[in-house]
């Protein structure tokens, strides 16, 4: 992604050791934040002819059915095993039904803005908003419930997924040089102590 060099040392260390070493700061003001600061919604950043939303649906769903003449890009239906709840959800594209499955920014964009993304270039913010590392297809209601919460204010109901979820948040924040708030770091350490050897995801 433009202008960002993923940290190499962190990829072999545990998430717990990495978060324990982080210096914390309070959230910056939300002043200046808009979704537009992160570029067009669901851009085709990897230039594969398919927008990011459909790329993630393709990655996370099974039994995909595609819209004709879209070169297996536009997903019209499929099955999601929601990582946040463990529920199986049948996705059907439509004005209302599409909301059943939403694409979650693991580190919410407004949260990222308040923890350092306001310092990034426009291209770096666009990369963050479309990075598969920071995106998951999830149950729509839980995505709405999460809002812009961090690990201190919201965690997936499915406890067995919390280590993966928190590890992914850490990986995103390290990659884009975002900081952690004290309550967020405390919550992450508490979760990762249940899986102390877990490494951070890279994709």
Summary of predicted features, one role per range:
Residues 25-28, 63-66, 121-122, 162-163:
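Short secondary-structure boundary micro-motifs
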Residues 6-9, 23, 28, 46-47, ...:
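Homeobox/homeodomain signature
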Residues 2-50, 54, 182-186, 193-203:
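N-terminal module-boundary/linker segments of secreted carbohydrate-active enzymes
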Residues 29-102, 106-107:
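Secreted/periplasmic proteins that engage bacterial cell-wall peptidoglycan
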Residues 16, 32, 39, 63, ...:
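A near-ubiquitous, low-amplitude feature marking generic local secondary-structure context
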Residues 75, 84-203:
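Domain-level detector of nuclease and nuclease-like folds
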């Amino acid at each position: 992604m433009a202008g960002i060099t993923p940290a190499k040392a962190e990829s072999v260390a545990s998430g717990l050791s990495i978060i324990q070493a982080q210096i914390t700061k309070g959230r910056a003001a939300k002043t200046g934040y808009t979704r537009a600061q992160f570029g067009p919604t669901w851009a085709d950043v990897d230039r594969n002819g398919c927008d990011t939303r459909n790329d993630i649906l393709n990655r996370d769903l099974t039994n995909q059915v595609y819209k004709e003449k879209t070169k297996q890009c536009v997903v019209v239906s499929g099955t999601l095993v929601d990582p946040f709840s463990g529920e199986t959800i049948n996705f059907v594209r439509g004005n209302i039904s599409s909301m059943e499955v939403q694409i979650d920014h693991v580190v919410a964009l407004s949260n990222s803005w308040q923890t350092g993304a306001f310092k990034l270039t426009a291209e770096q913010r666009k990369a963050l908003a479309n990075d598969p590392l920071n995106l998951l297809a999830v149950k729509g209601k839980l995505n709405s419930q999460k809002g812009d919460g961090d690990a201190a204010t919201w965690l997936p109901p499915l406890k067995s997924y919390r280590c993966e979820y928190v590890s992914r948040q850490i990986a995103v924040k390290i990659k884009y040089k975002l900081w952690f708030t004290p309550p967020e770091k405390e919550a992450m350490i508490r979760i990762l102590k249940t899986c102390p050897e877990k490494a951070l995801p890279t994709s």
